[in-house]
């Protein structure tokens, strides 16, 4: 790219969509969720998962991941720890497993 030339604004619509979606999620988190009380079976909560998924994967894939997570959040599912999958440029997060511990005797 030559000096003085601007990059095309192809990412702007996705950034605006991400900001809008995260803004709506924040309204839910701070305005509605406290009135309903804790209901999510997972950690992080479904709304926080959605925010993180949008931040890591963008608005389209992030919304898809959030929708899949919300569908799993029901009384028949045990819940538990369910982190957002790593993005294309992230190293996978290591969840707490007992593989590191020596075998018990």
Swiss-Prot record:
Disordered, as annotated region: 76-105
Feature: compositional bias, Basic and acidic residues: 90-105
Presence of the UniProt keyword Cell membrane in the record: yes
InterPro entries xrefs: Membr_insert_effic_factor_YidD (IPR002696)
This protein's record includes keyword Transmembrane: no
Keywords: Cell inner membrane, Cell membrane, Membrane
Highest taxon in the source lineage: Bacteria
Location of the protein in the cell: Cell inner membrane
Cellular component terms (Gene Ontology): plasma membrane
Membrane topology value: Peripheral membrane protein
PANTHER family assigned: MEMBRANE PROTEIN INSERTION EFFICIENCY FACTOR-RELATED (PTHR33383:SF1)
Family: Belongs to the UPF0161 family.
Function: Could be involved in insertion of integral membrane proteins into the membrane.
Protein name, per record: Putative membrane protein insertion efficiency factor
Organism: Chromohalobacter salexigens (strain ATCC BAA-138 / DSM 3043 / CIP 106854 / NCIMB 13768 / 1H11)
């Amino acid at each position: 790219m030559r000096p003085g030339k601007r990059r095309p604004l192809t990412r702007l619509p996705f950034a605006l969509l991400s900001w809008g979606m995260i803004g709506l999620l924040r309204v839910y988190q701070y305005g509605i969720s406290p009135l309903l009380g804790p209901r999510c079976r997972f950690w992080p909560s479904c709304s926080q998962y959605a925010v993180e998924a949008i931040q890591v994967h963008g608005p389209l894939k992030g919304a898809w991941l959030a929708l899949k997570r919300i569908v799993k959040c029901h009384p028949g599912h045990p819940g538990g720890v369910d982190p957002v999958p790593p993005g294309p440029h992230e190293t996978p997060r290591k969840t707490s497993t007992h593989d590191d511990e020596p075998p018990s005797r």
